[in-house]
Each structure stands twice: as structure tokens, then as C-alpha cells.
């Protein structure tokens, strides 16, 4: 499913660049990090399950293992089409905080590609956010903001949840906004 999504995005990118007479192909990806939590408590967040004494007995060893595996997978995204480059941007979901993102891009596979990230702490009571990983050689960030999720029914809006991260920047001389 993820490969089909990347292929569809690549085909769209090629069609867009062809129509605008720009030449170049850029991979854009998305990955659900599936609860990338560190093992320390964030005040005001319901992250107790991901503490050493919590439900998952989350600890440094498990955290570092997950970081290594995620960084390998993320660094390989887009390389079937662009082996030396990989993805220009990768939207990610279910990350706890800025600390987790910093630790993730510091892993050797992502560090070698020079990836950076954009993360804005959201209102989700569980501490689950979205972020954007990007290659600064390919994508220049101009602006980032968190857009709230608007519920259809007022009764549903009593629960704070993660919003959408909107990052605007330049890719291949075109201004683009990526929403995660």
C-alpha cells in the first residue's frame, strides 16, 4: 500500500513537472510512526503507557530499537526511483514530541541524507502529533502552522485531538504546501 502511494505521488509529481516545463522528479512520502514515544513523561500529556512502569514497559532499549528501524525504513523511501536522493519530504504521523523527532533524524541513515524536520506541538491529550521530515537541499521551508481539526458535530469538539501540520515551502522552484 505504501509503495502504491509513493508511486502515485511520483506519477503526479512527474505529470506536474512536465506540465510546468520543469524537469526533475521528486519523491514525496508518508509514514505512520505508530506511536513513536520516548520513555519520559511529558507534563500534561497522557503518555503513561509509554513509560518504563507503564503498560508497554517502554524503555531506552525499546525506544532506540524503534528509532533505528524507523530511520532505516524512512531513509529507503523513494530510493527505488531515486536511489541517491530518496524522498524530498516525508510526512509522519503519531510522534510524541520534538525530542522524538530530533532523535529520529539524528539516526545515521537519516543523518547521512541531511534530513531535518518540522514539528509543532499539538493539543492532543495523548501527546500524538504529526511532523514533516525534509531534505533541505530539495525543499526550503518558508512557513509552518498547525491547522485545527474541525468536528462536524459540536458535541464531538469537547475532545482535543491532533490537527494538521501545514508546511509551505519551495520544491523545484515551485511554491508548495504539504499538509500532514
Positions of the model-derived regions?
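Bacterial Sec-dependent N-terminal signal peptides
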Residues: 1-23
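Short, glycine/serine-rich, charged loops/turns that create anion-binding
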Residues: 11, 35, 137
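Active-site-proximal beta-strand elements of phosphoester/diester hydrolases
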Residues: 27-35, 143-145, 175-180
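Structured beta-strand-rich core segments of catalytic domains in phosphoester-bond hydrolases
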Residues: 95-175
